[in-house]
Amino acid sequence: MNSTSIERPSVKLMITVMCATLYAVGSYMTAYIPSPWGFGQFRPAVVIPAFFAVVFGPQPAAVGAALGTLLVDSIKHGYIYPGSLIAAVPGNFLGFYLIGWFLWRKFSWSRFILISNIGLLVANIVVAFLYVFAYKVLYQSQYIGTSVSVLVALALGLTLFWFVTMLPFVLLITPTLIQVAVNTFPSFVSPDLIEALGRKVPGNELGVSMLGPGVILLVVGLLVTYTGLGSWMLNNPAFGAIAKSIIEVLCYVCGAVLSALGLYFFRRI
């Protein structure tokens, strides 16, 4: 197989099925680790469609991610899960299509870092807002009549949770997977990818991509602890005491880890 044979429909179908299967299996491993709100899972398996997007292009990655997330959500719930159909499927499709569109056969480390941030942010915003404003309002009666400000806060909280728990895995693990693919099957990898792997990952850009979200999370944690934001969360139906405490811990722990990683990569320059 070479890089041009990926365009063949049969090969593209096989790659799409592989992406969907691996993504579903990887996602199921953490399917029961929820967000602070009890729905929306911790999902480091996003490294799988990110890898497929870079190596095989936007279509196999986007379709594979959409099918994979629908499969794992449906297995978890025991039926075709409407929340996945309404929110997770379009969000995963759009996010990984963007990553593949901008990186496939146009790869550089700088683009990879930038587009990974953008793709994950777009995907998580789409999933969070569709899940809250479409699925929750349409299918769960307790959300009917909830104020828009509360729903927006919930969607933004989900977006933040997903983004900060996915980004480090994509930026740190995906390059290793790409390197393994290039070393194992160099004939079907595009020349620009092989060339890019011969260059050093830009530590300053990788550092900024980690340090920026890390500092933001630490600031949010401090605001929750020491300002009226914490009281607002306690009295907000979208949060409550348990969610507030989990978010507080999450902000400090993830913020410290991301900041430490960012500073580490800066020191390696």
Residue ranges and their predicted role:
Residues M1-I269:
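Loop-helix junctions at membrane interfaces
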